[in-house]
Amino acid sequence: MLPCHMRSSFSMSLLYHAYVYLEFLILACTIYILAPGVYTDKIKWGIHEIDVRPDGNGFWGQRIRQNNPRVDGYELKINPQNESYYLPHPEGGYVQFENMINSTVQDGKLVMQQKSFYHVNDMPDFAKNKVLEEARRQIDAAGAADYKVEWLVSDESAVNQLTEFFKEHNVDIIVTFYPE
């Protein structure tokens, strides 16, 4: 048996090394869980085959780069990890979102000109119906996963118009101002 003074320093050293090892394991697990690019599966989204990893009721996966640099920058501002979140749609296929936080999927809407698709009050009926179609497809996918949908919109006027429009059409989407 070790003398008393040696036992306590030996125990402290052992505890310290166990603590360091535990911290390392926690860090390694966190990096693996959160690391973009560590993909284990593939899904088909439209014409694209996307590398993904399961998370919650959907998948984190590769983000498709946008041709317009402003739109691309806006999406990266919403999710700097350069990934998208994909939810399966109940009727097949997947719905893509820019981000997912606390069971809320987020979709970015960058308004680049006054005559925008998202200034719904100024749009003809066929354009309004396209907005409703997109919103309902997102709600169907999110609802099946027990998630909420939030649109992050870069223009305050569009935020107000979409909020009223969704209220009138009983569309449960949170519309939030999110500047460029």
PLM region spans:
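Active-site or metal-binding loop neighborhoods of secreted/extracellular toxin and effector enzymes
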Residues: 26-38, 42-49, 57-64, 68, ...
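Hydrophobic, gly/ala-rich membrane-insertion helices/peptides used by toxins and envelope proteins
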Residues: 1-44
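Glycine-rich short-loop/terminal segments
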Residues: 27-124
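Short, solvent-exposed coil/turn elements at secondary-structure transition points
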Residues: 15, 111, 179-180
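Generic serine detector
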Residues: 8-13, 24, 84, 103, ...
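Generic hydrophobic secondary-structure signal
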Residues: 4, 78, 91, 97-100, ...
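Residue-level marker of positions within ordered structural domains that often coincide
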Residues: 1, 104, 143
